[in-house]
């Protein structure tokens, strides 16, 4: 597998000495399914948003094989990087009043200028959106309003929207946080299938150890904005799990 992204000594601060991410280094490979594992507040969401250029790091670098250094990119390079980097959000980030199909079509906007995007999108985009909906098992809901879907179905719409971007990387921020166990398995299985069949790198943040072990090729454990472990999922030890959640347990006790 080829290296897709290289992150070196990355730090993100929201004020003096208030680091959400601190001195993080790791790489992502094509077609790799990686889980960012850690409790709430560990810095996982901030890290994901920095990889997509939505949050600016205060130090360090993010190097893309296709777009160079992200933090130093021109507006055009950054726009292309974001098009190649799809996001799947915890709260779906869908427009409830629009149809499922229209929400999925928004994943194609990065391929058009602002003025062109104000017009109806080409039929070829519509066909891509329908194909994505068929793949996530929602073709029969294409004309339904998003607000009428269950939480699990809405998350599948979010994944279909990511698919039509034709990305090289999918970043999924706690995509199963509000779902029941059955729906959680469906969503993670779908992301894993996309990763394996399409050779798209997937980086997903989770706090559930059992799901991380079940689905990840590699687990990057985070606590207090730092990487605690970075290794194959089968090699994650109980002592490392304890280290990931220790500060939360200590806070609960006190």
Swiss-Prot record:
Taxonomic superkingdom: Bacteria
GO cellular component annotations of the record: plasma membrane
Reaction catalyzed: phosphonate(out) + ATP + H2O = phosphonate(in) + ADP + phosphate + H(+)
Listed EC numbers: 7.3.2.2
Compartment list: Cell inner membrane
ABC transporter domain location: 5-249
Binding site for ATP: 38-45
Keyword DNA-binding set for record: no
Self-association state and partner proteins as the record states: The complex is composed of two ATP-binding proteins (PhnC), two transmembrane proteins (PhnE) and a solute-binding protein (PhnD).
Name of this chain's protein: Phosphonates import ATP-binding protein PhnC
Naturally occurring in which organism (per UniProt): Synechococcus sp. (strain CC9605)
Gene this protein is translated from: phnC
């Amino acid at each position: 597998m080829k290296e897709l992204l290289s992150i070196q000594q990355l730090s993100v601060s929201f004020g003096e000495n208030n680091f959400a991410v601190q001195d993080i280094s790791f790489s992502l490979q094509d077609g790799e399914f990686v889980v960012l594992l850690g409790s709430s507040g560990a810095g996982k969401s901030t890290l994901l948003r920095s990889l997509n250029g939505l949050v600016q790091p205060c130090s360090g670098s993010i190097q893309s094989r296709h777009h160079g250094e992200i933090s130093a990119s021109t507006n055009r390079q950054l726009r292309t990087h974001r098009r190649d980097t799809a996001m799947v959000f915890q709260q779906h980030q869908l427009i409830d009043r629009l149809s499922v199909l229209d929400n999925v079509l928004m994943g194609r906007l990065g391929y058009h200028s602002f003025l062109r995007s104000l017009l109806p999108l080409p039929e070829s985009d519509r066909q891509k959106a329908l194909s994505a909906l068929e793949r996530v098992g929602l073709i029969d809901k294409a004309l339904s309003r998003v607000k009428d879907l269950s939480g699990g179905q809405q998350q599948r719409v979010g994944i279909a929207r990511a698919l039509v971007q034709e990305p090289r990387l999918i970043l999924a921020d706690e995509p199963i946080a509000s779902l029941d166990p059955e729906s959680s398995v469906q969503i993670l299985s779908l992301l894993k299938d996309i990763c394996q069949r399409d050779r798209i790198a997937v980086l997903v943040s989770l706090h559930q150890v059992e799901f991380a072990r079940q689905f990840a090729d590699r687990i990057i454990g985070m606590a207090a904005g730092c990487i605690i472990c970075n290794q194959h999922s089968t090699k994650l030890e109980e002592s490392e799990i304890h280290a990931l959640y220790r500060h939360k347990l200590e806070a609960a006790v006190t």
